[in-house]
């Protein structure tokens, strides 16, 4: 069987991996084997945290809405239920922004659903 040296293909592969990990500390950006492992781990974390980010933001929005609603003597649960019953279609992101930036508008929404 003939020997395959791979030439520039192997070097290009290694350089691509090292470029991916260029901001990492120590051997994780210098040595190919550890850089390759850390690069795969980084991609795994990125995939996982894309879902976690959505989860965390939804939790933050709910907390902000609940805090603003309780200032007006209504719980988050009752408020969301009343919004659906009155067919007011505002998502949690928009409600949280209204609660934080425009208190008068938020109070008006609560007045409509009570």
Swiss-Prot record:
Keyword list, A-Z: Chloroplast, Plastid, Ribonucleoprotein, Ribosomal protein, RNA-binding, rRNA-binding
A single cellular component GO annotation: chloroplast
Compartments where located: Plastid, Chloroplast
PROSITE patterns registered for this protein in UniProt: RIBOSOMAL_L20
GO biological process: ribosomal large subunit assembly; translation
SUPFAM superfamilies: Ribosomal protein L20
Gene Ontology molecular function: rRNA binding; structural constituent of ribosome
This protein's record includes keyword Ribonucleoprotein: yes
Function, as annotated: Binds directly to 23S ribosomal RNA and is necessary for the in vitro assembly process of the 50S ribosomal subunit. It is not involved in the protein synthesizing functions of that subunit.
Annotated PANTHER family: 39S RIBOSOMAL PROTEIN L20
Family according to the record: Belongs to the bacterial ribosomal protein bL20 family.
Protein name: Large ribosomal subunit protein bL20c
Taxon lineage: Eukaryota, Viridiplantae, Streptophyta, Embryophyta, Tracheophyta
């Amino acid at each position: 069987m003939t020997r395959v040296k791979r030439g520039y293909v192997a070097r290009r592969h290694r350089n691509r991996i090292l470029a991916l990990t260029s901001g990492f500390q120590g051997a994780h950006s210098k040595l190919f084997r550890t850089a390759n492992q850390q690069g795969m781990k980084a991609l795994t974390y990125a995939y996982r945290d894309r879902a976690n980010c959505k989860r965390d933001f939804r939790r933050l929005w709910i907390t902000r809405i609940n805090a603003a609603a309780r200032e007006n003597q209504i719980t988050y649960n009752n408020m969301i239920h009343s919004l659906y019953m009155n067919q007011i279609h505002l998502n949690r992101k928009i409600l949280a922004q209204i609660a934080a930036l425009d208190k008068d508008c938020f109070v008006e929404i609560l007045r409509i659903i009570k």
